[in-house]
Amino acid sequence: MLLASFDRLLLTNGYEDVSVRELTANADVGRSTFYEHFEGKHDLLEHSVARVLVVIAAAAANRTPSDALLDVLTHVRAQRALASALLRGSTRAILIRVLALKLERQLAALARRSAAPPIAPPIAPLAFLALSLAQAQLGAIDAWLSCDDSCDVQTAARVLHATTRAGVVAVFGSSG
């Protein structure tokens, strides 16, 4: 109920104008109950997108586009208005930060494997690389949502995966 109310308010008011007071009233949830679970609306936003972003981040380690990535992109396309609002508004920076943290974990796992050839050590700090990949991934999704429906979900998944993997290969070499 709370997440559904949050989504509705994001679409109608925009993120900046969503207040915890309005959100809890709309969801018929007490403010104290809200704060038992979330520190504030930023925390709620992070929670609401976490499952989607963890799948997108996994593209860094997966050798092929996963079924989970197809499912996530299908969901994103079905929720195009909400996704576009999140990708283009003040929330984009939050999404980038959360995705970068998830990507950094993926890259750290690859870096641990880099002690044994043929994977090369990373060429820059992982936080910087993860942030760059996060911006590229969300940019690709935003571009896909901006296009007409001629680009299907499978194509979008292949492009997102290929561009993410190209970044990983550039950082770690061909076996990354």
Name every feature range the model reports, one short phrase each:
Residues 18-19, 84-86, 95, 153:
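Short, hydrophobic secondary-structure boundary micro-motifs
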Residues 5, 9, 136-143:
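Amphipathic alpha-helical interface segments
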Residues 112, 143-176:
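C-terminal peripheral helix-coil segments that are non-catalytic and often amphipathic
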Residues 3-7, 11, 16-20, 25-28, ...:
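An amphipathic alpha-helix adjacent to DNA-recognition modules
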Residues 67, 71, 92-118, 124-139, ...:
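Amphipathic alpha-helical packing segments from all-alpha helical-bundle domains
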Residues 86-89, 119-124, 150-154:
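Short, surface-exposed loop/turn segments at secondary-structure junctions
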